[in-house]
């Protein structure tokens, strides 16, 4: 009887807590944040729903038309759409660039004016426009009384930096947040060379790695270590 009473009075073991989901990195373009399934509310992800366009040195997001010549500033353009984080890579289609309109070339001699005719401009006789005297180009006369005064160069004011202030590194391929007190000569992993976009090929000139897809380009690891720089050009 005492054994049955002890068994009845014993407390049941508490259920084991559910294992926490491992953090994952969002694969949406322009986000790159880490998240868990337990902490992924709607609106927590800010991203670009469509891919970039590259034409004549200009970088532009096809979804929101935001553009920049500088690649670091282009990547810093915030996403134009919000939603939930995801680990699925988006399928981006290459956006064709608009071909430049060809300017028709005038081949008829009758359409060429005397001011653009090569023979008239050189002072030779031209059967289409008659004899045209060569235009006299006025020569600029220097005024000896006008002496240019050189203004002394004003040095830029020195910027005061708080060692504990969070700053964002603008080195290409980094983009991390850091504090100046933790900065050192191996704190930053970045690409020193410019990005190369040519014939649908994307890559870095510094490490000579080139790929076709923009997602693969963003995953090229940096090739150089150095100091974080929040004022990089």
From Swiss-Prot:
Zn(2+) 4 binds at residues 191, 206-207, 223. A motif (CCCH) lies at residues 117-137. It is found in: Cytoplasm; Nucleus. The keyword Ligase does not apply. It holds the Pfam family CHORD. Gene3D superfamilies: 4.10.1130.20. Its main location: cytoplasm. It comes from the Eukaryota. Residues 26-85, 169-228 form the CHORD domain. The gene is RAR1. Interacts (via CHORD2 domain) with SGT1 (via CS domain). Interacts with RAC1 and RACK1A. This is Cysteine and histidine-rich domain-containing protein RAR1. One of its GO terms (cellular component) is cytoplasm. Keywords: Cytoplasm, Metal-binding, Nucleus, Plant defense, Repeat, Zinc. GO terms for biological process: defense response to bacterium; defense response to fungus. One of its GO terms (molecular function) is small GTPase binding. Involved in basal disease resistance to virulent strain of bacterial blight (X.oryzae) and compatible race of rice blast fungus (M.grisea). May act as positive regulator of basal defense. Associates with HSP90 and is essential for the pathogen-associated molecular pattern (PAMP)-triggered immune responses specifically enhanced by RAC1. It comes from Oryza sativa subsp. japonica (Rice). Zn(2+) 2 binds at residues 48, 63-64, 80. Zn(2+) 1 binds at residues 26, 31, 45, 85.
């Amino acid at each position: 009887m005492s054994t049955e009473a002890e068994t009845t009075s014993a407390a049941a073991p508490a259920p084991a807590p559910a294992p926490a989901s491992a953090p994952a990195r969002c694969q949406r373009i322009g986000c790159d944040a880490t998240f868990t399934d337990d902490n992924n509310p709607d609106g927590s992800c800010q991203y670009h729903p469509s891919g970039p366009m590259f034409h004549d040195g200009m970088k532009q997001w096809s979804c929101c038309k935001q553009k920049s010549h500088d690649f670091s500033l282009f990547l810093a353009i915030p996403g134009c759409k919000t939603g939930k984080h995801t680990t699925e890579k988006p399928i981006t289609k290459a956006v064709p660039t608009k071909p430049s309109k060809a300017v028709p070339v005038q081949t008829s001699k009758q359409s060429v004016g005397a001011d653009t005719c090569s023979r008239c401009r050189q002072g030779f006789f031209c059967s289409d426009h008659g004899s045209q005297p060569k235009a006299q180009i006025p020569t600029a006369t220097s005024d000896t009384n006008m002496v240019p005064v050189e203004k002394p160069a004003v040095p830029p004011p020195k910027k005061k930096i708080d060692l504990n202030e969070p700053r964002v590194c603008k080195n290409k391929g980094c983009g991390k947040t850091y504090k100046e007190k933790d900065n050192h000569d191996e704190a930053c992993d970045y690409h020193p060379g410019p990005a190369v976009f040519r014939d649908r090929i994307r890559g870095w000139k510094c490490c000579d790695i080139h790929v076709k897809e923009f997602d693969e380009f963003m995953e090229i690891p940096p090739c150089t270590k150095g100091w974080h720089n929040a004022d990089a050009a």
